[in-house]
């Protein structure tokens, strides 16, 4: 595995950021298509 010298590995940041972005976009579009996103 990669040597972590106290810092968070860049791939971890990228993975978490990607999951958050996809999750937020997914919830937004799901709410829009469900008719619940109009109030957001």
Swiss-Prot record:
This is Photosystem II reaction center protein J. HAMAP family: PSII_PsbJ. It comes from Lobularia maritima. PSII is composed of 1 copy each of membrane proteins PsbA, PsbB, PsbC, PsbD, PsbE, PsbF, PsbH, PsbI, PsbJ, PsbK, PsbL, PsbM, PsbT, PsbX, PsbY, PsbZ, Psb30/Ycf12, at least 3 peripheral proteins of the oxygen-evolving complex and a large number of cofactors. It forms dimeric complexes. Keywords: Chloroplast, Membrane, Photosynthesis, Photosystem II, Plastid, Reaction center, Thylakoid, Transmembrane, Transmembrane helix. GO terms for biological process: photosynthesis. The chain crosses the membrane at residues 8-28. Belongs to the PsbJ family. It holds the Pfam family PsbJ. One of the components of the core complex of photosystem II (PSII). PSII is a light-driven water:plastoquinone oxidoreductase that uses light energy to abstract electrons from H(2)O, generating O(2) and a proton gradient subsequently used for ATP formation. It consists of a core antenna complex that captures photons, and an electron transfer chain that converts photonic excitation into a charge separation. GO terms for cellular component: chloroplast thylakoid membrane; photosystem II reaction center. Its main location: plastid. It is a single-pass membrane protein. The gene is psbJ. It is found in: Plastid, Chloroplast thylakoid membrane. InterPro entries: PSII_PsbJ, PSII_PsbJ_sf. It comes from the Eukaryota. The keyword Cell membrane does not apply. The keyword Thylakoid applies. Gene3D superfamilies: 6.10.250.2070.
